[in-house]
Amino acid sequence: QYQDFDITYFVSDDVFPTFEVFDRSRFGDMMIQQILPEKNRWCWLMQFMDGNRLDLKIQPVSVVPDYLAEDTLNTILLDKTGHYTNLTATSDRTHWVQRPTQSEFDDSITEFFWVSTYVLKGILRGELLYANTFFESIVREELYRLLTWRIGRDTDFSLSVGKAHKRLPAYFEGIESLYDLSDLTGTGQALSTALKMANDLLPSLSHDLQLTYDVASVERTTDYILRQL
């Protein structure tokens, strides 16, 4: 119960177009579904009344090699053609943390500190929704990018932090406090915590990744925001 299943059926190219009206009622008592139009595939996201969810795709058999290369977690359960018997073992390799380039590192740091000033502005103006929107959608996400790179570097970029960064709390204390945004005081504290985490992280992270960043700009921005909070 409460399981998510991702299943793809591959059909011959000539019959693939007919599956646009594929009968999906056989899978169970459906609560709601979402149909995603995608190139060279039919895709239905289905939530059933028993709590299970099925993401079902139907694709032409000609795309199997590209499909398998796209995500190393894919595995073949049944192959009626016999063409795909010598596959490598499944792994989450395609989801591992990737080493950042200098440009990606620069962009993340700049975005984090630049948008932190928007959050501060919202707090000082008493605009909670404005402040929270920028904190949740950008500031916290960019902090998570930095934290993820730290984990990647420490593990030789050989693991995934999971969907929605779900494994981050196992590596860093204080993550949960970044979600206490019910009032301006909470948002201010969350912003302060995020700034502290970033400032504590950046010197060692940049050194270990052999990347650079504008230290003076980071220090000026951090000092300005913390004095205003």
Regions found by a protein language model. Give the residues of each.
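Glycine-rich loops and low-complexity Gly/Arg-rich segments
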Residues: V11-F16, M31-L36, E70-T72, D79-H83, ...
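Short aromatic-enriched loop/helix-cap "lid" or pocket-rim segments at secondary-structure transitions
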Residues: Q1-Y2, L68-E70, V161
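Conserved nucleotidyltransferase catalytic core and NTase-mimicking acidic/glycine-rich helix/loop elements
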Residues: W96-L229
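Acidic, glycine- and histidine-enriched catalytic cores of nucleic acid- and nucleotide-handling enzymes
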Residues: Q47-L87
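Metal-dependent nucleotidyltransferase catalytic core
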Residues: Q1-Q3, I7-V63
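A general structural signal for short secondary-structure boundary/capping elements
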Residues: D50-Q59, S91-D92, Q102-E104, L181-S182
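Short secondary-structure transition/capping segments
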Residues: M30-K39, L78-A89, E173-L181
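A short, charged helix-loop
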Residues: N74-D107
